[in-house]
Amino acid sequence: MRRIPCFVLVVILILAAAVLPVAAQTLLATVPVQNFNFYLAANPATNMLYVLNTCGTDPNCNTNGTVTVINGVNNTVAATVNVGINPQFLVINPVTNKIYVTNRHDNTVSVINGANNTVIKTIAVGAHPTIEDVDPITNKIYVVNNGNGQGNSISVIDGNSDTATATIGVGNYPVSLAVDPVRNKIYVVNYCGAQFGCSAHFAPGTVSVIDGRNNTVTGTVTVGYGPLIVFVDNVTNKIYVSNSCGATPSCDSDGNTTNIMGTVTQIDGAALTTQTVNTGLGQAAMSLNAVANAVYITNSTDNTLSVINGSTLGVQTVNVGTLPQDVEVNVATNTIFVCNYNANTVSVINGNTLATVATINVGVNPVEAWVNPVVNRIYVSNVGNNTVSVLSGVAPTALQFVPVTPCRLLDTRPPGGSGPISGGTSQTFNLPQLSQTKSCGDLSSAVAYSLNVTVVPTHTLGYLTIWPGGQAQPVVSTMNSTDGRIKANAAIVPGGYQGSVSVFASDTSNVILDINGYFTEPGAQTLQFFKLTPCRIVDTRNNMHGGTLHAGVERDYTIPTNCGVPASAKAYSFNITAIPPSGGLDYLTVWPKGEAQPVVSTLNDNTGTIVANAAIVPAGPNNATAFYPHNNNTDLLIDVDGYFAPAGSGGLQLYTQVPCRVVDTRNSGNGFNGQITVNVQNSACLLPSNAGGYVFNATVVPPAPLLFLTLWPHGTTQPTVSTLNANDGFITSNMAIVPNSDGSINAFSSSQTQMILDISGYFAP
């Protein structure tokens, strides 16, 4: 993910080499940029790529640098932005859509507004700013100043005002840093450690540990010689530092580490103790996969990739191309990409088997890469011919469903729980372990979970996000409770590190996770999804379908076949709406008829408003399902949009997607009232054309009470169903599985509202 910073490299070897054979060609496009395009990064929230051209339009570097902006949807140049002199690095805050560029010779940082690609501010920092990192939670940017005088420091930039608010002194010749947003700590690598000025015989390097709450250095850790790159695994709380000189205190005076065995130091973030492992000759770059708990190091002299197991610190070696430079990993597919500088290729490696599955021809001298896991694209910067190669990623794994009797995995409420998640922080939960503890079944083979997520805010909750443990927090929300109500929302969430999921709460809130099934690789007992045009199967209003349900009394429904649900269905995809005549319902529980009522909730309503929630419900004997309102009478609406059954004609599999925002009407006006069409396939999320159904999280932001919102397939008649309700006028979310036939869907709002659609997966053959 990060190479050795270019200001440290004295010589870039440009040697002729034979191109390796290509096993599978996945080059999609080649985009021209400008001179010395050493670094690039993508904003996963907007699907825009930013390429840093250190020398701008002048190959002799006598002008300002530039940033080339590439539209990731069509792979064309959208803009070229002038920045300062000798720019070194850029970082993106996807939450604010701002890009920060360090200008080494100007001692400044250029701030680019990603909405209009203009420099909105230039911030003075310390001497020779280089590497930087951003904390998207606190909206602070940390800049390494490694020059003399004002150097040997970190500048802290407030992303709200884009002003430098603090300068923190660190060790000698700081070269890189990494932020842990979970613990609000910053780790700074000091190349020369405690020795002022570097020489051929220098002291070991150090890492300065900064507390982001008060900008103070709270610890200093000694690492190896010539440390350059640092990564933080915020799941295991381990920090990894690449030492280019390894255990050798006498690197060549020009910093040449060609024939020196590099090492990696693992720091325990709690105790600040260290362990060190050997890698290979001529370290070039390092990357981290927190989901797989693995660290990757390219070794440019012996043309290998070292793979470190974060648990055991065992090292495996993979042969790659000639003079490997950057290494990147797609944590969503566990695929590794290595830039082979002299071979003009990229090695594609399966992270599970460490087998090279493809070698792809790219441009001349590929030196840097970036993975956008949201759209499964890889971008490669070729400095030999000033281009960017766009590669497609490895296809996601097809998954099928295994229903589970609804079961409570987690409840943070005291006395049995660990207490609420503090506002502005996240926690990671190991669901397979929780499932064993709670007797919810064996989840060891689960790749993704079908959950019902309930929030119990202490006051109000701006938003909550749930995502795979070890992955970066996506710029989406799972649910909101701006009115402070207890709310539930269904979610299909892939498992991350050891099957874990992470949960972020913008404000302090308790969280409840109930499971009703999981998705895994196809097998003898797994089920495919069969889509249906949304259809209403139960409406108890006006004394229909048994009339109003009574508090504390179970009501059973046999799922009829008139909506296309066959007797072979083993689970149903419902949207359930509760309409209590007066007072709060407290909660409603839905489960397979014939089994004991589980201690779970399917939806919550403690104020008496109309509430909808999606639910995947296993089928009971004779296709019967049980419904239980806890504390009040209620009418029910039950809509079905699909079912799960053994494999057959028309059956679809789930393909999980790193959450991606398909549309946010707040960006283009006042929202809508009535019907609109959303072109999902042509959105920035780059979804495939064969998707048979989309898994959305739909959110409305109404200015006043909203009776209902309905989503349905484009090209079909609007069904008599609803997706969600916001009768109280507050922000409301609900999961929705919407069938697809032509890449678009329709949305109907009964009154004016803004709408946000985030996608977390799709069903396809």
Language-model-detected regions and their locations in the chain:
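Bacterial N-terminal signal peptides that target proteins for export
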Residues: M1-L9
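Detector for methionine-enriched segments
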Residues: M1, M48, M261, Q283-M286, ...
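The N-terminal extracellular segments of secreted preproproteins, especially immediately downstream
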Residues: P5, T54, N60, Y191, ...
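Sequence-pattern detector for short linear motifs
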Residues: P5-C6, V101, N107, V143, ...
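Predominantly soluble domains enriched in secretory-pathway, periplasmic, or organellar proteins
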Residues: V11-P396
